[in-house]
Amino acid sequence: MREVSLEVRTGELVALIGANGAGKSTVLSAIAGVVKPVSGEIAFEGELLIGMAPEQIARRGIALVPEGRGIFPSLTVEENLRLGAYVRNNGSEYKRDVEEMSRRFPILGERLHQAGGTLSGGEQQQLAIARALMSHPKLLMLDEPSLGLAPVLVDQVFELIDGLHRSGVTILLVEQNVDRTLDIVDRAYLLNTGRIETEGAAGQLKRRVDIASVYMGGRG
């Protein structure tokens, strides 16, 4: 990774797009403190995050939904949700938050006592996102949320992300599904072989004839 500079403003839905191996997930992992950069700065609300442990970063309001969802299959839906609330240490709000997640994600509300591993792929993705929202994040980072899902479930995931954005959630989205991503985001950065190739408003990028070739690792 080199010369990667990006910004997400409050209330925005911003995408980081690019081919496999471009470094998209590495950027999210660095922001979350999972990967330690050897140089550069990462700042959130004016505070430098470099050197902080992942749990410290989470307590500052950054939540990461990793590629592959990362739910605990042997735990119930409610137990998975409870894990998402640990950074807040506010048991009095827990019940209200579960009710809110049940409203946002009705299928989860119906299956609170069901093991997470018995849910479908799309339902597990909903659970992973709901678990992250239990922390009341100021920034929600989603890493390849549509990966491995059937087309109908991909539609549901993008509708969910769009709905979260419209409700005021600030989101940094990593995705390979460029067309669908540019339909819902405010802005996007195109990452190519470890550096930002271009950036701009979603509408501008959709009109760029060379986006597909750069996305595939070439030059348009």
Task: Please tell me what each predicted stretch does.
Residues 1-220:
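Glycine-rich phosphate-binding loops of nucleotide-dependent enzymes
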